[in-house]
Amino acid sequence: MEIIVNRESFINSLRIVSSISSEKLRPVKLLISQGVLKLESEKADYGEVVDEIEIGYEGDPFQIGFNSRYLLDVLIVIESEDIKLECKNSMSPTIIKSTVDESFLSVIMPLRVEW
């Protein structure tokens, strides 16, 4: 699967959603469907935070989890307006690419997220 997402929107949404997650893992769940990326995080004491952003994606809905800190670390250094996420399934490594600079490539491992 391949997703195109606005980098700044993704960063802002991740910061909002991860604001309540635990300091150690900072888990965030990405629910991907046609045209929409829904980000979720929760903490037992505080509840759940959900945010949605528009994306370029045409395919079957699926979900994948990540450590939000790792995602933010990659997104902050990319110097393009949009980024591309590529992965095979919810447990395979995800490749993050710039849509402008073909030399930029980062790989991030998913996190099993259940709630």
Language model features: what each stretch is:
Residues 1-115:
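DNA polymerase processivity clamps
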